[in-house]
């Protein structure tokens, strides 16, 4: 399957053959894509949320008032969960949210995410992702020619330093080497820009 190669000026400069098993899967598995995204989002959670239990709350262990004769409900501790300033029952604890997902499923999710973007016409192959200077204004002008609101840029094994520095201050734009290509960002961003090198490396990686 062939598709056109564009320059950073959004002009056609040639053609490239894409592996249909990676960029043009016939039936998109949305369930697999969602599975991988859920796995990614869970992995990104810090899991450091925590509340104090009765045993962890600071305070006296003295009985607040006598058992009988006050007319109040009996209480044994000011740190109990029903008391103001007391502990929390069944609150969140520090834990890892990471779940296991087979590598085959992760790989399949990436393939189907790339295929979905290509089917939508929002996956573009760029001849080179290199800039002469790390100027944000220059990159903003370049990206405006593609008429998109957000861009996920995937380069080869290494990212051009000037391009990376220029993209740092642009809202809704991210650039990563091919190893950073992931399902969540491919789906989240409106356009995916792939360098020619990224195409060949991804095809080798996902074969």
From Swiss-Prot:
One of its GO terms (biological process) is translation. Residues 50-75 are annotated as: Disordered. One of the primary rRNA binding proteins, this protein initially binds near the 5'-end of the 23S rRNA. It is important during the early stages of 50S assembly. It makes multiple contacts with different domains of the 23S rRNA in the assembled 50S subunit and ribosome. NCBIfam families: rplD_bact. Part of the 50S ribosomal subunit. Belongs to the universal ribosomal protein uL4 family. GO terms for cellular component: ribonucleoprotein complex; ribosome. InterPro entries: Ribosomal_uL4, Ribosomal_uL4-like, Ribosomal_uL4_dom_sf. Gene3D superfamilies: 3.40.1370.10. This is Large ribosomal subunit protein uL4. GO terms for molecular function: rRNA binding; structural constituent of ribosome. The keyword Phosphoprotein does not apply. Disulfide bonds: none annotated. Keywords: Ribonucleoprotein, Ribosomal protein, RNA-binding, rRNA-binding.
């Amino acid at each position: 399957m062939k598709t056109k190669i564009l320059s950073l000026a959004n002009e056609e400069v040639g053609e490239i053959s894409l592996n249909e098993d990676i960029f043009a899967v016939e039936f998109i598995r949305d369930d697999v894509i969602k599975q991988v995204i859920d796995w990614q989002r869970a992995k990104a959670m810090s899991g450091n949320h925590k509340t104090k239990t009765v045993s962890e709350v600071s305070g006296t262990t003295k009985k607040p008032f006598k058992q009988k004769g006050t007319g109040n409900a009996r209480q044994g501790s000011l740190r109990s969960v029903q008391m103001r300033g007391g502990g929390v029952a069944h609150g969140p604890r520090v834990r890892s949210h990471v779940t296991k997902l087979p590598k085959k499923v992760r790989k399949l999710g990436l393939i189907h995410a790339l295929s979905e973007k290509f089917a939508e016409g929002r996956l573009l192959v760029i001849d080179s992702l290199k800039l002469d200077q790390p100027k944000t204004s220059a990159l903003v002008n370049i990206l405006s020619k593609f008429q998109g609101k957000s861009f996920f840029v995937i380069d080869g094994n290494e990212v051009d330093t000037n391009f990376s520095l220029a993209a740092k201050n642009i809202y809704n734009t991210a650039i990563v080497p091919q190893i950073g290509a992931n399902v969540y960002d491919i789906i989240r961003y409106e356009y995916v820009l792939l360098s020619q090198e990224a195409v060949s490396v991804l095809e080798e990686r996902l074969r």
